[in-house]
Amino acid sequence: MLEGLNDRQKEAVLYNEGPLLIIAGAGAGKTKTLTTKIAYLIEEGLAYPYNVLAITFTNKAAKEMKDRLYGIIGDLAQKVQVSTFHSFGLKLLRENYAKLGYEANFVIMDSDDSLTVVKKIVKDLGYDPKIYNPRAIRNKISSCKNEMMTPEIYERYAVSDYEKVMHKVYEKYEEKLKKNNSVDFDDLLLLPIKLFKENPSVLQRYQELYQYILIDEYQDTNEAQYILSKLISAKSRKITCVGDDSQSIYSFRGANYKNILNFEKDYKDAKTILLEENYRSTSTILDAANQVIKNNTQRKDKNLWTSRGKGEKIKYYRAYNERDEAQYVIRKVKELRNKDVEYKDIAVLYRTNAQSRVLEEEMLKENMPYRVIGSFYFYSRKEIKDLIAYLRLIHNSKDNVSLLRVINTPKRGIGLKTIENLTIKADEIGTSIYDAISSGKELEFKKTIEQLKSLSEELTLTELIDKVLDASGMRQELESEKTLEAEVRLENLEEFKSITKSFEEREGLVSLEDFLLEISLISDVEEYKDDPNRISLMTVHSVKGLEFNHVFVVGMEEGIFPHMNSLMETSELEEERRLCYVAITRAKDDLHLINARRRTLFGKEQINPVSRFIGEINKDLIETNVKEEELPKQEKKIDTEVMFREEDVDYQVGDYVYHETFGTG
């Protein structure tokens, strides 16, 4: 059973005397180690299968672990409790619902259901949903629950008017759920903790049942998961936590990397084992990752190594702009294809979703098959399709398809019945739906479109986009949500202005009709959707857990990666560095780090310095490809020294600038 394990992995499998922390670097075989440890406990008679609780973070990871166990111990694997935290919480609720005041047929609400409840409460309490955005409140309730903050606790900290309203809604929300015999997704963690704290005998029963607790990806645990882990393991103290503090990149979801850093404080007698041998990457790639992450202060000291050999140097390219950056990727992909490399072995990583747009356009021009993982194709994203529908309606008011898409987007109180009646009326009088509008809220919508029509004749395309985002309410709706998802969608809408700006610079003053024709030619990606052999485009957050032979990381600039929002906070900058570590360690054989001297992003041109993360890698690991003569002939070279001259500069509000201490902003 221990065959094929290295000495550190064997040590981790064989140690079962008390708390164990396994710090497993990227590609160090942690899943294999964890699975073998479970099998060893059972095969050696140290535990019955039902005495083992293994927690993973995704259903996919749980299935993979279960399948591996089947391969080692056969049908006994069926009796091992392998699940996510939420699945385990649900099991506890089903077995103890009465003690928490629920009936057997309690309902689990999904995020859409809980949002519907919050919307109704906001309306019933008489609050303006434009000020007290239901989605923002729903997300805040979720955060509160993950931080173990009940309505009673939250009330103590509610000072502002908004927080007091938030407390009232939270309180009513909990009352409504209990009254309807319902729980939400976050309750699957919160209620088991409540159950254990209020019923010591129930806690003792589960502590005696689960004598060995193993938790994967411990660096990603939030407060509720951390407390649940401590409660269930308090008696046996035979808890094994596996993770890598250097890969903790989900703080925006409530994950607290300090849980793994504080493990030895929580369990004074804990043993720590480092898994540092990497089976994925070349030593050059690992040396680069080690050199970057060592600049973080909040970390466990470890050093990844491999017996694979040095491999190729890391390729660095400083492009002229984002278009040149994408074209570099295209050139290198073509070279790889000439060496019989398959598209599916290639990944392009970026910090924000909006960066995929230029890459997608260039790949479409070259007929290169690609897939966007963890998101939609840029032109398929809902907010982009909504914006294009507005533009099409402004251009052609007879476009019923576009009108039906946006007449109540964002919501403006025009219901399905009204729309149905309008459609019938238009059919009866033989006209477009737009022309059939004559009263009500739909007439206000029509007036907005008419105003935008007039403006379209005097504004540039980029200026028109800004007016559409404001007049339609799209920008206000997303800004009021105060969620990460809304922030990403807003970034995508702002990035659309880069398309119009680029189009205007290339073609001069153009009509809305010409622009709509242009994007209709580049937004169709259906041809390759069923082909598994495609290049993978994704954010660094989406790539965790994956690996590719050839990896391109684009946008390696200050303000992009690391992200502008992180530059003023040490903790956030360290998370950006962990993200960079994750990006680097996805590459098996071949890594390209790319940036641009100038970049048009969100409709604004930026001149960004090279990312500090590139500067943290020893130059002897890097093969540089920066050739001034390769700059596009029609564009001027930038004298970067101008950025640092001691003379007055005419700055305007909205300009992006670089400061030696504060970075880009």
Where are these regions (language model features)?
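ATP-hydrolysis module of ASCE/P-loop NTPase motor domains
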Residues: N16, A77-V80, A98-D187, Y210, ...
